[in-house]
């Protein structure tokens, strides 16, 4: 797949984006969900080795192809690793899946009801390395806990500044200002976020595009103006703590928004499964998320 093919696939392809980008902090939880206790490994190297085995098993599964999975978001160590003897991004591209990389370095402490992204001093070097490996885009996450306009405006400003740096590095940014679905002010936070993103999009130069990864809104259809915006390549949704059936029901209510699920994709997979069981379970999850993304049919 050339750059133009990847852009076209992400812009209008039928399917969803798999999020396989758990980082150091969330890896023990991901492994536990997969059926591997913390006592089964010692030290980061063993931990990352196990999570890489899990991701390799997913990526090489017969169901994990570009037919239903448009793209996959990787953690930096996964990007630098190999699958079937090939660099992970190349292995994905071979399967028709567009590679993205998570670039943020975690969250600052909460202030003004939000958590900004920590500084990324080595971002240009990472972007250059990712570009060299055939990666198409990036993803960067911050979190909104309360409907504080000052805080949300600061989050959006920071996200679009990082996106500009990503575009300058030749990659497509996925901007992810996650609204905490447990927030007591969720609906108001969704609305303020929409307004601030629209302002930032209008300020982008003509011809520039970004992607958006957003929490499923409390009010269905709220993000229609973003789906229709010429400066947005695609709007994707995170599962944000919803279990897969619930996430798919919510997703199906939102026109033009496709999934970019992590936990909701992987929640039924277990280390102990035979390959046959594992592949069947993953195929079932992919089908369910595909239908909610494309056909807008909740499971």
Question: What positions do the PLM features span?
Answer:
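Eukaryote-skewed repeat-based solenoidal scaffolds used as protein-protein interaction platforms
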Residues: 138-212
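Alpha/beta catalytic barrel-like cores
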Residues: 1-136, 144-146, 196-299
């Amino acid at each position: 797949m050339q750059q133009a093919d990847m852009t076209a696939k992400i812009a209008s392809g039928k399917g969803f984006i798999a999020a396989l980008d758990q980082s150091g902090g969330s890896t023990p939880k991901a492994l536990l969900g997969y059926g591997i206790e913390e006592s089964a490994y010692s030290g980061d190297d063993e931990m990352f080795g196990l999570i890489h085995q899990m991701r390799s098993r997913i990526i090489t599964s017969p169901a994990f192809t570009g037919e239903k999975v448009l793209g996959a978001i990787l953690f930096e160590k996964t990007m630098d690793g190999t699958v079937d003897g090939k660099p992970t991004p190349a292995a994905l591209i071979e399967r028709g899946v567009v590679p993205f990389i998570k670039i943020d370095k975690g969250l600052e402490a909460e202030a003004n009801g939000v958590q900004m992204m920590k500084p990324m001093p080595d971002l240009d070097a990472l972007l250059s390395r990712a570009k060299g490996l055939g990666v198409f885009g990036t993803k960067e996450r911050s979190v909104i806990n309360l409907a504080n306009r000052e805080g949300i405006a600061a989050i959006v400003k920071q996200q679009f500044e990082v996106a500009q740096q990503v575009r300058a590095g030749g990659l497509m940014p996925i901007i992810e200002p996650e609204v905490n679905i447990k927030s007591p002010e969720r609906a108001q936070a969704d609305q303020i976020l929409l307004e601030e993103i629209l302002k930032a999009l209008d300020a982008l130069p003509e011809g520039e595009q970004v992607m958006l990864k957003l929490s499923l809104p409390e009010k269905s259809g709220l993000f229609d103006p973003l789906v229709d915006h010429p400066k947005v390549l695609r709007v994707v949704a995170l599962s944000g703590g919803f279990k897969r059936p619930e996430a798919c029901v919510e997703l199906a209510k939102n026109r033009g928004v496709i999934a970019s699920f992590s936990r909701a994709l992987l929640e039924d997979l277990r280390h102990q499964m035979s390959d046959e069981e594992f592949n069947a379970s993953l195929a079932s999850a992919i089908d369910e998320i595909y239908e909610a993304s494309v056909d807008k049919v909740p499971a």
